Amino acid sequence: ALCDLHPDRVEKSQAILKKAGFPEAATYSGSEDAWKQLCDRADIDLVYIATDWARHAPMMIYAMQKGKHVACEVPAVTTLKEAWDVINTAERTQRHCMMLENCVYDFFELTTLNMAQQGLFGDVLSAKGAYIHNLEPFWKYYEGDWRLKFNQEHRGDVYATHGLGP
């Protein structure tokens, strides 16, 4: 099943599936709560969440309460309370909840891991990494400038797991 606030994005995804020879997927779109209809389906095992960050925790919690496993883009949560709410829901519902972290498998991260495993840094007692990149060309892509606003209102590295994941 496919879900997005914007029907045109669902249509694009549907076209990709069709071109690849997959059957047509059920679609949900056009309202703020369309994703809940997807989660309510009995034939869905896993929900993959790739929305603005403010929606991650509520969507993960709802999906797990509906018996779904969850895979969510980073950051999965933006507050400590959200983290505990997600953890407690996963434990209570016995559903898997995974934060997707594709950047930890990039060349630089795996090279650093390999060097550490070879002992090139000696005994590693502590390490810190960060993931910082210029998002200026993408600001218009993020509806309502949610990503720019988040970065303006919060300090620190919102992708703390990117730099040293493995």
Tell where the protein language model's regions lie, with residue ranges.
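Short, Asp-centered acidic motifs that coordinate Mg2+ and/or phosphate
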Residues: 1, 46, 126
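N-terminal Rossmann-like dinucleotide-binding module
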Residues: 1-20
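Conserved hydrophobic residues forming the short capping helix/wall of the S-adenosyl-L-methionine
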Residues: 14-18, 87-90, 116
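A short helix-to-beta-strand connector/capping loop
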Residues: 20-27, 92-96
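A structured beta-alpha segment of the ubiquitous adenosine-cofactor-binding alpha/beta core
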Residues: 25-46
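Structural detector of well-ordered beta-strand residues that form the stable sheet scaffold
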Residues: 28, 71, 98, 127-128
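Beta-strand-loop-alpha-helix segment that lines the small-molecule cofactor/substrate pocket
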Residues: 46, 52-53, 57-105, 119
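Predominantly a Rossmann-like dinucleotide-binding segment in NAD(P)-dependent oxidoreductases
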Residues: 96, 103-166
